[in-house]
């Protein structure tokens, strides 16, 4: 049985990760928002401490009904 593990061990070699550096992003690379669609506004008085969770569900449902989720610029996943 040890021969089996020896043969298996020599075939399975961990590949080194490529040394790819990610480009750093600075503020000059970021432009103005494009295709922005304002769906709703939540004021400070609308999200009280007692009803915050219940209100959140209502706002999320309103936002779902407003927009088309198939837009290419939308990267939200399901509010």
UniProtKB/Swiss-Prot annotation:
<feature type="region of interest" description="Disordered">
    <location>
        <begin position="48"/>
        <end position="79"/>
    </location>
</feature>
<feature type="domain" description="CRIB">
    <location>
        <begin position="30"/>
        <end position="43"/>
    </location>
</feature>
<dbReference type="GO" id="GO:0008360">
    <property type="term" value="P:regulation of cell shape"/>
</dbReference>
<dbReference type="InterPro" id="IPR039056">
    <property type="entry name" value="SPEC"/>
</dbReference>
<dbReference type="GO" id="GO:0005737">
    <property type="term" value="C:cytoplasm"/>
</dbReference>
<keyword id="KW-0963">Cytoplasm</keyword>
<keyword id="KW-0581">Phagocytosis</keyword>
<comment type="subunit">
    <text>Interacts with CDC42 (in GTP-bound form). Interacts weakly with RAC1 and not at all with RHOA.</text>
</comment>
<keyword id="KW-0449">Lipoprotein</keyword>
<dbReference type="GO" id="GO:0006909">
    <property type="term" value="P:phagocytosis"/>
</dbReference>
<dbReference type="GO" id="GO:0005886">
    <property type="term" value="C:plasma membrane"/>
</dbReference>
<keyword id="KW-0472">Membrane</keyword>
<keyword id="KW-0206">Cytoskeleton</keyword>
<protein>
    <recommendedName>
        <fullName>CDC42 small effector protein 1</fullName>
    </recommendedName>
</protein>
<comment type="function">
    <text>Probably involved in the organization of the actin cytoskeleton by acting downstream of CDC42, inducing actin filament assembly. Alters CDC42-induced cell shape changes. In activated T-cells, may play a role in CDC42-mediated F-actin accumulation at the immunological synapse. May play a role in early contractile events in phagocytosis in macrophages.</text>
</comment>
<keyword id="KW-0133">Cell shape</keyword>
<dbReference type="GO" id="GO:0031267">
    <property type="term" value="F:small GTPase binding"/>
</dbReference>
<feature type="lipid moiety-binding region" description="S-palmitoyl cysteine">
    <location>
        <position position="10"/>
    </location>
</feature>
<feature type="lipid moiety-binding region" description="S-palmitoyl cysteine">
    <location>
        <position position="11"/>
    </location>
</feature>
<dbReference type="GO" id="GO:0005856">
    <property type="term" value="C:cytoskeleton"/>
</dbReference>
<keyword id="KW-0564">Palmitate</keyword>
<dbReference type="InterPro" id="IPR036936">
    <property type="entry name" value="CRIB_dom_sf"/>
</dbReference>
<dbReference type="GO" id="GO:0035023">
    <property type="term" value="P:regulation of Rho protein signal transduction"/>
</dbReference>
<keyword id="KW-1003">Cell membrane</keyword>
<dbReference type="InterPro" id="IPR000095">
    <property type="entry name" value="CRIB_dom"/>
</dbReference>
<feature type="compositionally biased region" description="Basic and acidic residues">
    <location>
        <begin position="63"/>
        <end position="72"/>
    </location>
</feature>
<comment type="similarity">
    <text>Belongs to the CDC42SE/SPEC family.</text>
</comment>
